Curated annotation (Swiss-Prot):
It comes from the Bacteria. GO terms for molecular function: ribosomal large subunit binding. This is Ribosome-recycling factor. It holds the Pfam family RRF.
Length: 188
């Protein structure tokens, strides 16, 4: 039965890791004070008759802390890339120089920082909910094993404690990531 506990923990760990990875991707899209290529990664460009990720039509660079650049590989796509960046909803104003697009990042207002911090909090809370759902599923599996008399009451308690420790660990990681992101957002 010990192997079953390990299998259960591995499954729950994999699923909780997935929730944490989703949070990291969502946080990467929240623009803080510094430039990061992750800011433009979700941008999709109308190219070759379909929408493709920006990373498939050019290189994203960070020449300085408040500037991103996009080196577009195909000259015919420069205006489409510029339009996609302008329309992505991040309030960016790209400037084109040949096949290089410069994207200066404006200073964040206090109001915008508060909005970003609230969004980060919402992302963190939805991740906590996802982790708790994984925990609930694990607890249900343990109860199922106990009902089928596959494990005893003491073993079920031990397993439940292990699942709770795992859940607490991941919730703490979410909280730590949120504190770090809020600090990043509020940094002037």
């Amino acid at each position: 039965m010990a192997a079953d506990l390990n299998t259960l923990k591995q499954d729950l760990t994999r699923r909780m890791d997935g929730a944490l990875e989703t949070l990291r991707r969502e946080f990467a899209g929240l623009r803080a004070g510094r430039a990061s290529p992750a800011l433009l990664e979700p941008v999709r460009v109308d190219a070759y008759g379909s929408e493709v990720p920006l990373t498939q039509v050019g290189n994203i660079g960070v020449p300085e802390s408040r500037m991103l650049t996009v080196q577009v590989w195909d000259r015919s796509l420069v205006s489409a890339v510029e339009k996609a960046i302008r329309d992505c909803g991040l309030g960016l104003n790209p400037q084109t120089e040949g096949q290089l697009i410069r994207v200066p990042l404006p200073m964040l207002t206090e109001e915008r920082r508060n909005e970003l911090a609230k969004a980060a909090g919402r992302y963190a809370e939805s991740t906590r909910v996802a982790i708790r759902a994984v925990r609930r599923d694990g607890m249900d599996q343990i109860k199922g094993h106990e009902k089928k008399s596959e494990i005893g009451e003491d073993e079920a308690k031990t397993w439940s404690d292990e699942v709770q420790k795992l859940t607490d660990h991941y919730i703490k990681r979410v909280d730590d990531a949120l504190v770090e992101k809020e600090k990043d957002i509020r940094q002037v």
